[in-house]
Amino acid sequence: MTTVDKLKSLENKLSATNIIEGLYDKYENDSYMYNKIHNYICNQLPSIFESMHQLREQRVTRIEELSCEQDNFIQSFLNNNQYFYNSTTDNYFYYDKLKYVLYNEDDILHHVLSSISRGRNLMSWKHKTKINIMKRIRENSLINSIPESNTIQMVINSLCPTIFDSRNKAKYFLTILGDNIFRKNTTNIHFISPNAKDFIKNLNNISQILIGSNISQTFKYKYHDHSYPECRIVNVNECIKNYNIWSIIINDYTLDILCVAMHYSNRYNNSDEFLLNDCNDSNFVNKVFYIKNVEQTLLVDEFINVFIDIDNKTIVDNKTIVDKQITQITWKNMQYLWKLFLD
C-alpha cells in the first residue's frame, strides 16, 4: 500500500469512528436506541459484512469460471467452424476445408445460439457470448484465409487443363488475380487473348459482388503503346471462348478461385516473384517475359520477318540497272500489323 493509500485509509477510519461516536453521543440518554446501536455494530454488522464478502467472492469465482468457459467455448467454436467476413461488402463466408460458400448472418447467429444452448453452461451469458463470437468473426477477414491443400488442388484442376495447359500457368494466373485484389504491381500489363474477355469479365463481376475487388485491371486484350518492361504474356487455351466451358468454372468455383488467388499473392509476394523464384518451367517464364526482356531491335526484326513481305524489283536509276528491295505500306497499316504482332 502506498503512502497516499495509507493516508486515505486512515482518513476513512477516523471518519467512520467519528460517525459511530456521534451516534453513541446522540442517543446516550435513550437506552433503547443506545442498546440497538451497540447490538447492531457489535453483533449484526460483522455478520452482514462477512456475508457480503462471501457473496462477492462467490460472484467473482463464478465470473472467472464463466469467463474461462466462454473463452474455451468461443475458441472451440471458431476452430471447428471457419467463418470469415468481408467488411467491404458486409458478406460472411463459411469454409468447410474444401469449399468456401457465401453465408447468411442469420444462419450464423442461429448456429451460435443453438451451440450455446446445447452446452447449457453459458446460458446466463448467452447474449454476451453471441456478441463476442460475432465480433471475432468480423475480425476474421477472408483475405487472411489459408486454403487447405485439397482446396488449392481443386481450384488448379478446375483451370488446368481446361483453360491452361499447365499447372504453372494456372498458378501464375491465380497469383495475378491475387495481386489485382491487393492492388500490387498495378503498372504491369498482362496481355491475354481476346477469347478470354467474357471469362475475365464475369469472374470480375462476381468478385465485385463477393469481396468488392476488381481482379481485371491489369489484363489487356490489345496493345496500345504500353511500356515494354511492364508487359507480360498470359497464354490461355482456345476453348476459353466457349461459354459452356468457363461458365461451369464461374458458377462452381469463383469464391474458391478468389481465396486461392489471395493466398498465392501472399505466399509468393507477387506474380513476378512466383515466376522468378518458384516456377520450375524456364521456357514458360521466358514466354511470359518475352516482350519485357527482348531487345527492341530484335523484336522489330521478328516483326518484319513475320508480317512484312519484301519484293525484289529491278529499277532503272540513271540508266543503270539496279536490284533494290522495295516495301510499300502505309503508316496506318504498319501500326495495325504491329499491334497484331504484339497481340
Model-derived segments and their meaning:
Residues 37, 258-261:
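Short alpha-helical scaffolding segments that buttress acidic/His motifs in well-ordered protein cores
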Residues 88, 98, 214, 224-250, ...:
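DNA transaction DNA-binding modules
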Residues 1-249, 253:
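Intein modules and their embedded homing endonuclease domains
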